[in-house]
Design a protein with these regions (language model features):
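Accessory RNA-recognition modules of RNA-modification enzymes
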Residues: 1-178
């Protein structure tokens, strides 16, 4: 919700801005729920902020999760902005931080972006999945629109695609295939 805690899930009905965490959603695969839970817990623990669409501040924008039904292969892509300086919170966010100091915890993440992403990757790989984790990606997106635009992707683990089989055909699926 507006200026609320970090949330990861779906847009609240009738709201373009509010996100509701859907940790127990039964219409998605169990592996999706586990990835969402691990990601949310990790970034909350690190005090990393979500991207605020109107202020253009914050770091986390989108989490893409793809899983092949037939092969069970899983691809995860974290989409972030590059507008946050590391270590910790700096740059454009300082004015916002100073005005909301009571809401900022003292133990904000003080490492580099690489260290932050390595920690997230390790947390994801430590979890147990029914499927097979084939790739963990980090995509940068500074587009002001609320769309996932690829302005550069790094492979943190594995590969940047997975395979799915359908009617005897094999398809190579990337984060931006659909």
């Amino acid at each position: 919700f507006k200026d609320g805690p970090l949330a990861l899930g779906m847009h609240k009905r009738g709201s373009f801005y509010d996100i509701v965490t859907v940790e127990n959603c039964q219409i998605v695969d169990e592996d999706f729920r586990k990835i969402l839970s691990v990601t949310l817990a990790y970034f909350r623990e690190q005090n990393i902020t979500y991207y605020h669409k109107l202020r253009h501040t914050g770091y986390l924008r989108h989490l893409l999760v793809r899983k092949a039904v037939k092969t069970g292969e899983i691809l995860v892509d974290l989409v972030t902005t590059t507008q946050t300086d590391f270590p910790g919170i700096a740059g454009a966010q300082m004015d916002e931080v100073e005005s909301t100091l009571n809401n900022v915890q003292e133990n904000a993440f003080a490492g580099t972006e690489e260290e932050l992403l390595e920690g997230w990757k390790a947390a994801l790989l430590a979890a147990d999945y029914k499927g097979i984790m084939t790739g963990i990606l980090h995509t940068r997106n500074d587009n002001v629109a609320d769309t996932v635009t690829n302005e550069g992707t790094d492979v943190l683990y594995g590969q940047d695609f997975f395979y799915e089989e359908l009617l005897g055909l094999r398809f190579k699926i990337t984060p931006f295939s659909f």
